[in-house]
Regions:
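Generic structural signal for hydrophobic residues
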Residues: 2-6, 124, 233, 270
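Conserved N-terminal alpha-helix of the aminotransferase class I/II PLP-enzyme fold
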Residues: 1-29
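Residue-level recognition of short, structured coil/turn motifs
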Residues: 11, 15, 132-133, 242, ...
Length: 355
């Protein structure tokens, strides 16, 4: 395929792995990569603190049938230091002979820590490999693709996992996730996905490859619009006195903008504004609910053409302190701007801010 060959020219060390076309989202891709490369008796280490909520059941932090823990894979984590930097002493102490794989979540998820740059990730990978040369370093690259000049595979990552209904799909990919990196690791993922001995040699493409490649072609422009929208969001809410992560003048590492709103009511008003600006289901009123995979109610605003797409205008967050909402996406800068202005209008109507 010319498209795949072109990617390999751009990223010479990159082995394009599983590109799953069914209803496949990043948690599935991460579970696949972990399950394929961890065996009973191995240990998984997170040197960046707790994983994203939906991975807790995959790992077994919260009990769930089929988790890694159920299959004899242990887990430990090293929390970040109070300033958000890596605890290198703690990481060194945590790595031992059973530590098989290190998982690095680039984006903040539902936390208010800064997201990590490719350069920071590269330094962490080098440190981990200095402690144990054969350790596998995997990066959850969701929301970070194309935001910086470098990607995790440029700075030593053995395996990178992400979603096609986020940055790389450019808003056109209707579904899909990806795993890429070192050939032997990707082969194991392919065997896990289909069957040993079959790997990537089987599977229907369902006529979706054109959408994937066209989305990838447009992705740099779409991601740029999304980043611009995030900066605008930070500037607006920063000026109103809310804490925003990152700040409006900080360097961007991903497309997510966190805004600490301080109350359930403010989160709901914000999300109602985003939903009202949506091209699909703008008449719907988002409400918090017990979403599978989360330990608290979650509110989501996403009137998107592709269900679950977070490169399209969207906002969400768990209903818990510090009541932070996470804004991302916008296929065009103008739509992102409209969404934020609508969120401000709903906040004003609810008597939560004064302009």
């Amino acid at each position: 395929m010319p498209g795949v060959k072109g990617l390999k020219v751009l990223r010479p060390g990159l082995h394009l792995g599983t590109l799953k076309k069914n209803r496949f989202e990043p948690t599935h891709a991460l579970a696949l990569a972990l399950g394929a490369n961890l065996l009973p008796g191995d240990e998984l280490l997170s040197p960046v603190g707790a994983p994203y909520d939906t991975l807790e059941e995959v790992i077994g932090i919260r009990p769930s049938p089929g988790s890694l823990r159920e299959y004899g894979v242990s887990y430990r984590q090293v929390d970040l230091l109070p300033d958000g930097s890596f605890d290198y002493d703690g990481i060194r102490a945590a790595i031992h002979e059973k530590t098989k794989l290190v998982t690095i979540q680039r984006s903040k998820g539902y936390a208010t820590r800064p997201s990590f740059s490719a350069e920071e990730i590269g330094k962490l990978i080098a440190f981990c490999k200095n402690c144990k040369p054969d350790i596998i370093c995997m990066v959850d690259n969701c929301y970070g693709e194309l935001v910086e000049r470098q990607e995790p595979t440029d700075v030593g990552a053995d395996m990178v996992v992400g979603s096609l209904i986020k940055n790389l799909g450019g808003g056109l990919a209707p579904t899909g996730g990806y795993v890429c990196g070192r050939q032997d690791l990707i082969d194991r993922c392919a065997y896990r996905l289909s069957a040993p001995g079959l790997g990537k040699e089987v599977g229907a493409n369902l006529g979706l490859l054109t959408s994937f490649y066209q989305g990838l072609f447009l992705a740099p422009t779409v991601v740029a619009s999304s980043v611009k929208g995030a900066i605008f969001t930070a500037g607006c809410y920063e000026a109103l006195g809310f804490r925003v992560v990152p700040g409006s003048r900080e360097v961007r590492r991903d497309i997510i903008q966190a805004v600490e709103l301080g109350s359930r009511e403010a989160m709901c008003a914000f999300c109602k504004g985003i939903q009202a600006a949506a091209p699909v289901d703008s008449y719907v009123t988002p409400e918090p609910w017990a979403m599978p995979g989360y330990d608290s109610d979650v509110i989501m605003a996403a009137g998107a053409f592709v269900q679950g797409s977070s490169i399209e205008l969207s906002a969400d967050g768990p209903i818990r302190e510090p009541y932070a909402v996470y804004f991302q996406g916008g296929l065009t800068w103008y739509h992102a701007k409209l969404g934020i202005l609508m969120s401000l209008q709903k906040m004003v109507e609810a008597g939560l801010v004064n302009l």
